[in-house]
Structure formats: C-alpha cells, structure tokens
C-alpha cells in the first residue's frame, strides 16, 4: 500500500506481476537509460519483464499486489539510483535477499550516507537525502 516515494530502482532477474487493487499508480522504469512511466490503474494488471530497473510510485490510499517468483539461492536483487537531472547511473548494489527489512535499509544507508554515491559524475547534480 501507499504512499511510496522512493527514488531507487529495483532490479530483479525474473518478471514481476503487478495487480492494482485500489487506486492508480505509476511504475517508473529505465529503458536504455531513458526513464519511462507506466501507469497501472485500479483493476489492471501488468507483467514487468525480467532485468528491467523499476520503481513503483504509490500515492495515498492505494493498494496493490506484486508477485515475484522464488529466487534461486545464488540469485541477486539490486537497487539502482539514477541522476534526477540527466539519468546517468549514480550507484548500484546487488545482494542475495534474505531479509527485506534489514537488507534494504543497509543499502539505503550505503547510498544516502555517501555524498560521493549521490553525486552525478556526468552533470554534478547531488541527489538529496530523504
């Protein structure tokens, strides 16, 4: 459920199935280093192909279901951040996901705790901390 205003993009080796139960959302994807917004309206489904960086943006009072297949033991998830101005990749980190609550917070700390990671090497824009 929403709201969700994260700036990271999730990387998954397999497809993800979205079913939007209440309200409308936008799933931001990166397609060849170009941001694309995919609206998913209430009652709609969407199958995200594998290996597409994506960032679901949920407003208040939205409820959705996301189904992912079980990962192989050595399969990694990733979080990627892109410059908000020029879309150059800022930082990426990959990990075998065992505990979503603790592991995501650790990766967020690695990124947001480092001005170097948040600074675009292409245009110099610095992503603000949340």
Task: Locate predicted features.
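Jelly-roll (double-stranded beta-helix
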Residues: 2-19, 24-45, 53-130
């Amino acid at each position: 459920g929403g709201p969700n205003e994260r700036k990271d993009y999730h990387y998954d080796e397999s497809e993800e199935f979205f079913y939007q139960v209440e309200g409308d959302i936008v799933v931001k994807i990166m397609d060849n280093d170009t941001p694309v917004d995919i609206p998913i309206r209430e009652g709609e489904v969407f199958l995200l192909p594998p290996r597409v960086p994506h960032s679901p943006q949920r407003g208040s009072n939205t409820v959705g279901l996301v189904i992912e297949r079980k990962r192989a033991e050595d399969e990694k998830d990733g979080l990627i951040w892109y410059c908000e101005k020029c879309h150059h990749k800022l930082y990426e980190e990959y990990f075998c996901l065992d505990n979503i609550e603790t592991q995501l917070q650790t990766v967020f700390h690695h990124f947001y705790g480092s001005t170097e990671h948040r600074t675009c090497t292409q245009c110099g824009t610095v992503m603000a901390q949340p």
